[in-house]
């Protein structure tokens, strides 16, 4: 009869680690030693696994900042002057393609796995992370020890440019804030698949796509393939993602960072694609698709992450004051697209698709530029402009009223060059701001999202708009005095009251916004539909997308006397008959 060996009695002085080694020597294999976890909540670092083709995902970074890791393949490569995958140190601006002999790039795990759920361990390419050093400086993205792909001053200045192909965009009908992370990733993948099927010559067009599930079909809308397949220069900076046609230098779109809510790569069959969701006046909320040369998609994602990182550090150096919800509505984004609070949100704006809500982000988008008449001015985009990038102004003292013949002889305002939107982009992380104020004993209204009474979205970029508020321009007083002498200026007037005064096509008037001081709105009737066009940008400059004017009177006189329509989003607004105010 076999007897089991007696178990050793418990001894509090027993060395458990030594006993484990002794037991392992009896035939069992000692457990593999795992690397110690970093200071953040991520698991240990693993080397890239062969055949692991999980998609690249860069999501907007708030408020779970310390949990995010970016795959940074080029961070582990020694940079050389002739390396095509990153900008050279001698000022080379365009990044052409990745190294031809480079293998498949390791990609980033899902955010759900990064947050600690599941048994799979997280890996981040590029060696050990400098997590402690990075967190000490208030960053929210852990980068490889060897650093980002590009110098910070280049990303904060002119930006890093990549030669890619613009494949079009797919309308997103629901707010990304209302979707979980997995659904957002599926939305971007499905948008990439839709575009690959629709555009001839797309890299992923040969594979058979699964039918779109019902939930995704209710989220994705129609596609816009106007510029599909066009080679473009993608410039990534702390201000925006700028898409410019490589041949004619036409700006296809300029999406500010605060209007971008999600960015991701494709699935294994579409690994060379980058998709990001942004808002603009033309496409509303849409998922824009970029096709990258082989091996370059990961660099594009990493550079976007670097731009977000730098913008957040700029906020830490210059945190804005805490604003009330009413001030937030009267700030940059609200004043630009929804200045009339009493109106329903689905009202037809001058630059809206029918039935769609006005966009919330400040964006410059010139998709319809080629359809404009020569010399025609475009509608104002709701973007702040720094004076050094607004283009040449008209000579001071140039007549803007009086004899129409004199105004007709005035040359058209010079076109504006490419613009930077903010001198010093600054960000708001409401949670960190409230904690900092409480630590120093500062007083301020509590944030309901921080206290848990309202859910906060991890990818919500809207808190940044607090940092973008600008005070009312001082010249608004003189502008108001000047407008009082114009017969077509009606003072403060609601949208409904203004539309009631329009009877014939070509009727127009200018009114002052009832909710935003210093903002003036051009209201006109075209093809039986009222149009509402903002005339003053957040810097207090009267401008259209291509030109700036000395005053509102100058803008009205220039377009009316020269019979030039204002073109925006495929529609024209002709200024023919001014509706004079009643005394």
UniProtKB/Swiss-Prot annotation:
Residues 488-579 form the SH2 domain. GO terms for cellular component: cytoplasm; focal adhesion; plasma membrane. One of its GO terms (biological process) is epidermal growth factor receptor signaling pathway. GO terms for molecular function: receptor tyrosine kinase binding. Coiled coil: none annotated. Residues 1-92, 113-137, 372-416 are annotated as: Disordered. Keywords: Acetylation, Angiogenesis, Cell junction, Cytoplasm, Growth regulation, Phosphoprotein, SH2 domain. It is found in: Cytoplasm; Cell junction, Focal adhesion. It holds the Pfam family PID. Residues 16-44 have a biased composition (Low complexity). The modification N6-acetyllysine is found at residue 154. The modification Phosphoserine is found at residues 36, 139, 453. InterPro entries: CEP152/SHC-Transforming, PH-like_dom_sf, PID_Shc-like, PTB/PI_dom, SH2, SH2_dom_sf, SHC_SH2. Signaling adapter that couples activated growth factor receptors to signaling pathways. Participates in a signaling cascade initiated by activated KIT and KITLG/SCF. Participates in signaling downstream of the angiopoietin receptor TEK/TIE2, and plays a role in the regulation of endothelial cell migration and sprouting angiogenesis. This is SHC-transforming protein 1. It comes from Pongo abelii (Sumatran orangutan). The gene is SHC1.
């Amino acid at each position: 009869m076999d007897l089991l060996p007696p178990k050793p009695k418990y001894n509090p002085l027993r060395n458990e680690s030594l006993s484990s080694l002794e037991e392992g020597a009896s035939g069992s294999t000692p457990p593999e030693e795992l690397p110690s976890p970093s200071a953040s909540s991520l698991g240990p670092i693993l080397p890239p696994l062969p055949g692991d083709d999980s998609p690249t995902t860069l999501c907007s970074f708030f408020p779970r900042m310390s949990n995010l890791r970016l795959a940074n393949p080029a961070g582990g490569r020694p940079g050389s002057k002739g390396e095509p995958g990153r900008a050279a140190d001698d000022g080379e601006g365009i990044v052409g393609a990745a190294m031809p002999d480079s293998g498949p790039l390791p990609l980033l795990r899902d955010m759900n796995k990064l947050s600690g759920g599941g048994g799979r361990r997280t890996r981040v390419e590029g060696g050990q992370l400098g997590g402690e050093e990075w967190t000490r400086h208030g960053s929210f993205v852990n980068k490889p020890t060897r650093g980002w792909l590009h110098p910070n001053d280049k990303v904060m200045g002119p930006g890093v440019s990549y030669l890619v192909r613009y494949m079009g965009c797919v309308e997103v009908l629901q707010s990304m804030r209302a979707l979980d992370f997995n659904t957002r990733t599926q939305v971007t993948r499905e948008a990439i698949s839709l575009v690959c099927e629709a555009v001839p010559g797309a890299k992923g067009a040969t594979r058979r796509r699964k039918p779109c599930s019902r939930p995704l079909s209710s989220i994705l809308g129609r596609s816009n393939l106007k510029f599909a397949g066009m080679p473009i220069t993608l410039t990534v900076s702390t201000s925006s993602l700028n898409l410019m046609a490589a041949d004619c230098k036409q700006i296809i779109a300029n999406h500010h960072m605060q209007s971008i809510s999600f960015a991701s790569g494709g699935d294994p069959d579409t690994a060379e694609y980058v998709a990001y969701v942004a808002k603009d006046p033309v496409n509303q909320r849409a998922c824009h698709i970029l096709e990258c040369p082989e091996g370059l998609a990961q660099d594009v994602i990493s550079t976007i992450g670097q731009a977000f990182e730098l913008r957040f550090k700029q906020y830490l150096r210059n945190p804005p004051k805490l604003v009330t919800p009413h001030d937030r509505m009267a700030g940059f984004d609200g004043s630009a697209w929804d200045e009339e609070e009493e109106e329903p949100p689905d009202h037809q704006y001058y630059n809206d698709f029918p039935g769609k809500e006005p966009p919330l982000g400040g964006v410059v988008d010139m998709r319809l530029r080629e359809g404009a008449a020569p010399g025609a001015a475009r509608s104002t985009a709701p973007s702040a402009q720094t004076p050094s990038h607004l283009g040449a102004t008209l000579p001071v003292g140039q007549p803007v009223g009086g004899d129409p013949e004199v105004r007709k002889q005035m040359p058209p305002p010079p076109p504006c060059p490419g613009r930077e939107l903010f001198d010093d982009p600054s960000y708001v992380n409401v949670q960190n701001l409230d904690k900092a104020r409480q630590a120093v004993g500062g007083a301020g209204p509590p944030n309901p999202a921080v206290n848990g009474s309202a859910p906060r979205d991890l990818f919500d970029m809207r808190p940044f708009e607090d940092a973008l508020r600008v005070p009312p321009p001082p010249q608004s007083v003189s502008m108001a005095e000047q407008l009082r002498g114009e017969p077509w200026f009606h003072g403060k007037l609601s949208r409904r009251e203004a539309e009631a005064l329009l009877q014939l096509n070509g009727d127009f008037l200018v009114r002052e916004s009832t909710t935003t001081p210093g903002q003036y709105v051009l209201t006109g009737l075209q093809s039986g539909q009222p149009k509402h066009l903002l005339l003053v940008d957040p810097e207090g400059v009267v401008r259209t997308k291509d030109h700036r004017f000395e005053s509102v009177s100058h803008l009205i006189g220039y377009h009316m006397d020269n019979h030039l329509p204002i073109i925006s989003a495929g529609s024209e607004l002709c200024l023919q008959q001014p509706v004079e105010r009643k005394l």
